[in-house]
């Protein structure tokens, strides 16, 4: 299925980007002619990595996976960013029913703000459905192995983050 001549936005904080995000990105690319990964600077959400590093990690991971997508950081309303990018589709990944409740509400609000922009929900693949950036950061913080969830370069950034947080 290809939504002809469509630009899609896959937004997130990507703090950090995980294999779950990459799974959605790969699948989203099949649905639109152009995919923009919007790295959000959300003032209401604490992030461990700054916007430049999150954007850089996303660019490296997407390029390393051989995915053709643009990575752009943004702040403010998602639908405003989508409109600025001439996107007509917002793509959101869903891991669990709890994600759906929140995402469904957000899609309704976005529709009310800009009805010309649709939201598409992609369920996480079976092997990525329980990966979250929060879980990955917690596992790394506690010294666990996160190699099943993120790339080696992201693992290195998590190690650096933990060193900084521990005053090393």
From Swiss-Prot:
The UniProt record lists the EC number as 2.7.7.3
EC class of the enzyme, as a word: transferase
**Which annotated residues bind substrate?**
13, 45, 78, 92
List the pathway annotation: Cofactor biosynthesis; coenzyme A biosynthesis; CoA from (R)-pantothenate: step 4/5
**Keyword ATP-binding among UniProt keywords:** yes
Q: Which GO terms describe its biological process?
A: coenzyme A biosynthetic process
Specify the domain of life of the species encoding this protein.
Bacteria
Query: One GO cellular component from the entry?
Result: cytoplasm
* Keyword terms: ATP-binding, Coenzyme A biosynthesis, Cytoplasm, Magnesium, Nucleotide-binding, Nucleotidyltransferase, Transferase
Cofactor dependence: Mg(2+)
What terms describe the molecular function in GO for this protein?
ATP binding; pantetheine-phosphate adenylyltransferase activity
Where does this polypeptide localize? Cytoplasm
What reaction is this protein's catalytic activity? (R)-4'-phosphopantetheine + ATP + H(+) = 3'-dephospho-CoA + diphosphate
Binding, ATP = 13-14, 21, 93-95, 103, 128-134
Task: Name the cystine pairs.
Answer: none
Marked site (Transition state stabilizer) residue numbers: 21
Q: Which family does it belong to?
A: Belongs to the bacterial CoaD family.
Q: What does this protein do?
A: Reversibly transfers an adenylyl group from ATP to 4'-phosphopantetheine, yielding dephospho-CoA (dPCoA) and pyrophosphate.
- UniProt xrefs under HAMAP family: PPAT_bact
Assembly with partners or alone:
Homohexamer.
Q: What is this protein called?
A: Phosphopantetheine adenylyltransferase
To which species is this protein native?
Answer: Wolbachia pipientis subsp. Culex pipiens (strain wPip)
Kindly list the organism's lineage: Bacteria, Pseudomonadati, Pseudomonadota, Alphaproteobacteria, Rickettsiales
| Gene giving rise to this polypeptide | coaD
């Amino acid at each position: 299925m290809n939504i002809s001549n469509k630009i899609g936005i896959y937004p997130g904080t990507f703090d950090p980007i995980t294999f779950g995000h990459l799974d959605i990105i790969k699948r989203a690319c099949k649905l639109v002619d152009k995919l923009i990964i919007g790295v959000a600077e959300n003032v209401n959400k604490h992030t461990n990595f700054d916007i430049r590093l999150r954007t850089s990690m996303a660019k490296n991971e997407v390029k390393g996976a051989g995915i053709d997508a643009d990575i752009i950081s943004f702040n403010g309303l998602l639908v405003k960013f989508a409109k600025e990018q001439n996107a007509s589709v917002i793509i959101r990944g869903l891991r669990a029913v709890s994600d759906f409740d929140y995402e469904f509400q957000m899609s309704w609000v976005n529709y009310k703000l800009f009805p010309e922009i649709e939201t598409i929900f992609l369920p996480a693949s079976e092997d990525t459905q329980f990966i979250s950036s929060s879980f990955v950061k917690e596992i790394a913080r506690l010294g666990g192995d996160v190699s099943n969830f993120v790339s080696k370069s992201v693992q290195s950034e998590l190690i650096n983050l933990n060193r900084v947080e521990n005053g090393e």
